[in-house]
Design a protein with these regions (language model features):
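Extracytoplasmic
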Residues: 84-87, 104-110, 119-127, 138, ...
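Short, solvent-exposed loop/turn elements at domain surfaces
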Residues: 97-103, 121-124, 133-136, 244
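Soluble non-cytosolic domains of exported or imported proteins
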Residues: 103-107, 137, 146-153, 172-176, ...
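Flexible, solvent-exposed short loops/turns enriched in glycine
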Residues: 123-150, 204-205
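Solvent-exposed, polar/charged alpha-helical surfaces in well-ordered, non-transmembrane soluble domains
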Residues: 141, 145, 153, 157-161, ...
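Flexible, polar/acidic helix-loop-strand segments at domain edges
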Residues: 183-270
Length: 281
């Protein structure tokens, strides 16, 4: 008699029932585990979102007088089509020689951050501070004077009217916020030339006096991890080869290095960064 014929039919039937019952229980456990894991992931995502939302309250928000902001209404349909799906934010860096005063001062740094809402790609464009533009009422002068004359509303209007834009969002920072941010990130790596190292000396001395820091001068060119004062001094260099073209390039280089460093930082560092710096924005 074959081995198959020796199998007890009743025992085999019970075995199949038990096997199916076990598989159902195992599948149910897997579903419960999957749901549990998904709940944990969703809770973690929610916790991170709530964490950053809670920190946003630290940012000093100024309610713009929209009646004072001019938007170029003569933009062609072709340009409007290209601009659809993008958001442009004006970024101003003030030379106000004082901490925390973001309502006045010349905007010696003017950048436009263009955000692709679909890909989240960000492109930075600088507006040279010595560019002669209509700063309001048909008066043409250096564009960095608009912020000093009428605050963010006039500076934004100047950009909209002269550059065919429709900006309504902006960010303003001063020396102190940049210095604090770089220091909290542990510095930023920069390649410095001999000429740049020499030109940074005067700016480092001035920033030390303004902020109470004791940043050291650079004796020669090379690759350095710049602290906040040194990075700000580097971004402020306005002499040497390249003039304002090179100066704005340095500003974008520092900002890009800060973003990359922040992306590599742990949550504790990011938390400190938000707590310390958001009040200066």
């Amino acid at each position: 008699m074959s081995q198959r014929e020796n199998v007890n039919p009743i025992r085999e039937q019970n075995h199949r029932k038990n096997s199916r019952r076990y598989q159902k229980r195992a599948a149910a456990r897997r579903r419960r585990n999957t749901i549990f894991i998904m709940e944990i992931v969703l809770l973690l995502i929610l916790a991170v979102v709530l964490f950053f939302v809670s920190k946003l309250s630290k940012i000093e928000k100024t309610k713009l007088d929209m009646d004072k902001i001019e938007v170029n209404e003569d933009i062609s349909q072709e340009s409007r089509k290209i601009m659809k799906g993008y958001q442009t934010i004006a970024m101003f860096g003030l030379d106000n020689r004082s901490n925390g005063n973001l309502s006045q001062g010349r905007s010696d740094v003017i950048m436009l951050a263009n955000i692709n809402n679909d890909t989240k790609e960000v492109k930075l464009v600088s507006v040279y501070r010595d560019t002669y533009l209509d700063t309001g009422d048909g008066i043409f002068q250096k564009c960095n004077a608009a912020y000093a004359k009428g605050g963010p509303e006039q500076a934004i209007s100047m950009l909209n009217v002269n550059l065919d834009l429709n900006i309504t969002d902006y960010v303003t920072v001063d020396f102190n916020s940049i210095i604090e941010c770089v220091d909290l990130l542990g510095g930023v790596d920069m390649e410095i030339t001999d000429d740049e190292a020499s030109l940074m000396t005067g700016y480092i001395r001035e920033l030390n006096e303004l902020t109470g820091n004791k940043a050291e001068n650079l004796t020669q060119g090379g690759t350095y991890t710049l602290n906040g004062v040194q990075a700000c001094a580097y971004a402020r260099i306005r002499y040497g080869g390249g003039d304002d073209y090179r100066r704005t390039e340095r500003q974008r280089t520092v900002l890009t290095a800060m973003v990359k460093k922040a992306q590599q930082s742990d949550l504790t560092t990011v938390n400190k960064l938000i707590n310390e710096v958001c009040g200066d924005i």
